[in-house]
């Protein structure tokens, strides 16, 4: 009995000590953050999972492209931590959208959390990651030094935004990116090795930033190898917070949330990247624009290219790329989708996770249709595979990556798709040839294996050399170097 009471006393003593320690901790005040500094804790990006969507800032030399290019990092925070109430405004593009797409856009004003650009990395593709640097980084101190290991491309050039300007500073990020890209294009031409394309890519659901960058290196590297050097892209890879948890079970419940995020990404910063940076700069410099997405990444890229950005620049914010990095007309974010067809030369949807009816204009559960069936791009190419078990699980819509969708579309001449197939080596056969604005490819012979550390059957079998052959064949046919 004495031992029992002794044990109880020890337990109570331990509990008392623990409570006292917790009380003491509660009294400890955190060090004040100097004005102008934005920390992860302030804006809700401090958990181990959330840090994985800006991991390049911690490992700029290790988590990097194996060729020159840019990584644009988009994250998501509670809106009250990054922008004042009512700061999110829409451009005239909003009025041009279908009711379903307007509903998607409205989430940018109503969701508890908001997507924003947190960083842009410039990778040089050198040994040991030499020279990789931060072009834009919200996590900087008042002296312009990153709070993480990534260093500024130009010493002292990083000036993080005030916390409540984190969202609106996305326009500054895009202006900085455009100026850097313009310098790269001009420099490459002077060196006698001009770029042929601006190439933008977005990966899909449940993809951490480090994995997305590895995937970029695989896909783009294989396409460059397939071209024997004829394909020289100025690359931009955009990463986004596409994962909820390390638990596969928990992630199942994130499907609807993340497909909405993909739509919002296309209607916001990805759309703005195309409209304000990639398309006008490429037109000015004589380059082709190729945009590629996989799964929910294809959902985001199609929204950006086919519907366009609905975000308007805050009043007084200079237009991007006029008179230098910034300048020209004030405010508003005017303009639609680059004046109709021709904005993007080639949009490729690899195993897309969105409804084909967004393109065909037929009934969809969400009422979301692209204006004029995605007439804003010169050429649209979709792939489908019978071996993809991820897109076939959607019961409320015919996703573009599903072979059953391909069969329905290609049996109906009214859809205006030119249909064909890819062989196991990435060769394609389509009729008619380059004149078709829309092409649909049965890639079942090519997209056939379960990729390493992935699910959904062959949904992610896009990282092999043969897929690079397919991409180069599509680029050569629909968006050849000028």
PLM region spans:
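Bacterial N-terminal signal peptides that target proteins for export
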Residues: 2-13
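Compositionally biased, intrinsically disordered low-complexity segments
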Residues: 4, 17-20, 31
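Bacterial N-terminal signal peptides
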Residues: 11-23
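Residues embedded in well-ordered secondary-structure elements
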Residues: 14, 189, 336, 369-371, ...
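Preference for short coil/turn "hinge" residues that link or interrupt alpha-helices
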Residues: 15-18, 198, 289
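Structural motif
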Residues: 17-20, 192, 339, 372
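Flexible, membrane-associating and regulatory peripheral segments of lipid-active enzymes
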Residues: 24-254, 278-281, 325-333, 405-412, ...
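Serine-dependent carboxylesterase/thioesterase catalytic core
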Residues: 26-39, 207-401
């Amino acid at each position: 009995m004495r031992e029992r009471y002794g044990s109880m006393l020890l337990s109570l003593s331990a509990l008392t000590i623990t409570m006292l320690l917790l009380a003491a901790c509660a009294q400890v005040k955190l060090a004040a953050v100097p004005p102008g500094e934005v920390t992860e804790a302030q804006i809700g990006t401090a958990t181990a999972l959330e840090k994985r969507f800006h991991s390049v800032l911690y490992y700029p030399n290790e988590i990097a492209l194996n060729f020159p290019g840019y990584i644009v990092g988009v994250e998501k925070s509670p809106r009250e931590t990054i922008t004042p109430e009512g700061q999110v405004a829409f451009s005239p593009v909003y009025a041009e959208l279908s009711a379903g797409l307007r509903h998607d856009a409205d989430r940018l004003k109503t969701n508890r959390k908001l997507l924003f650009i947190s960083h842009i990395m410039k990778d040089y593709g050198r040994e040991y990651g030499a020279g990789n640097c931060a072009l834009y980084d919200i996590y900087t101190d008042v002296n312009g030094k990153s709070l993480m290991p990534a260093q500024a491309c130009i010493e002292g050039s990083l000036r993080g935004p005030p916390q409540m300007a984190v969202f609106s500073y996305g326009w500054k990020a895009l202006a900085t990116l455009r100026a850097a890209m313009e310098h790269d294009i001009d420099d490459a031409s002077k060196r006698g090795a001009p770029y042929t394309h601006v190439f933008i890519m977005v990966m899909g659901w449940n993809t951490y930033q480090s994995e997305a960058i590895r995937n970029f290196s695989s896909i783009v590297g294989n396409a460059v190898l397939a071209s024997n050097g004829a394909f020289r892209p100025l690359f931009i890879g955009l990463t986004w917070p596409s994962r909820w948890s390390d638990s596969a079970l928990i992630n199942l419940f994130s499907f609807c949330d993340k497909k909405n995020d993909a739509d919002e990404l296309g209607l916001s910063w990805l759309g703005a990247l195309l409209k304000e940076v990639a398309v006008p700069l490429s037109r000015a410099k004589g380059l082709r624009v190729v945009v590629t997405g996989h799964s929910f990444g294809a959902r985001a890229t199609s929204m950006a290219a086919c519907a366009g950005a609905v975000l308007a620049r805050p009043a007084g914010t200079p237009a991007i790329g006029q008179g230098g990095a910034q300048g020209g007309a004030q405010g508003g974010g005017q303009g639609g989708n680059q004046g109709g067809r021709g904005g993007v030369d080639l949009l490729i949807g690899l195993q897309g996770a969105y409804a084909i009816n967004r393109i065909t204009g037929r009934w969809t559960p969400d009422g979301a249709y692209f204006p004029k069936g995605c007439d804003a791009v010169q050429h649209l190419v979709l792939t489908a595979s019978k071996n993809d078990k991820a897109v076939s699980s959607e019961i409320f819509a015919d996703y573009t990556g599903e072979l059953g969708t391909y069969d329905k579309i290609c049996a109906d001449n009214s859809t205006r798709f030119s249909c064909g197939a890819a062989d196991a080596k990435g060769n394609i056969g389509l009729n008619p040839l380059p004149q078709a604005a829309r092409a649909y490819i049965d890639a079942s012979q090519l997209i056939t294996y379960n990729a390493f550390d992935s699910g959904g059957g062959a949904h992610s079998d896009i990282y092999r050399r043969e897929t690079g052959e397919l991409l180069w064949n599509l680029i050569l046919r629909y968006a050849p170097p000028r």
